[in-house]
Amino acid sequence: MSQFTYKYTTESELFSFDFNPVLNTGETLSTATCTAITAQGTDPNPSAVLSGSPVISLGKATQRVVGGLNENIYRLIMTCTTSDGNTYTCTGDIPVYSPTAT
């Protein structure tokens, strides 16, 4: 699991997962699906932090993340299929804070 640096509720950022260490020589990512859950805190709709679909480039899958609720930790679950028929999953936690919270 990856631990990403925090983001503010007001930010829109890209978060990438590097699958290159597990890919065989010549193997490429074919599809990517990203899911968001709340790892800590409460959010009735954690998938709302996902903006658009993941983008695949050079063995990495990247997802845009927006908003989120103050003091929650969101877990991104990125699952990719490959040209060799393999399926790999990476996860990463993103702490979210409000820039105006005291």
Language model segments and positions:
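Predominantly extracytoplasmic/ectodomain segments of secreted and cell-surface proteins
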Residues: 1-27, 96-102
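Extracellular acidic loop/turn motifs
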Residues: 21-31, 40-45
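Low-complexity "stalk/linker" and mucin-like segments enriched in Ser/Thr/Pro/Ala/Gly
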Residues: 39-58
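Short strand-edge motifs at loop-to-beta-strand transitions and within beta-strands
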Residues: 59-63
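Surface-exposed, short loops/turns at beta-strand junctions within beta-sandwich domains
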Residues: 66-72
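Short, conserved beta-strand segments of beta-strand-rich sandwich/propeller modules, principally
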Residues: 73-77
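Beta-strand-rich extracellular modules
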Residues: 79-83
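C-terminal edge beta-strand
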Residues: 86-99
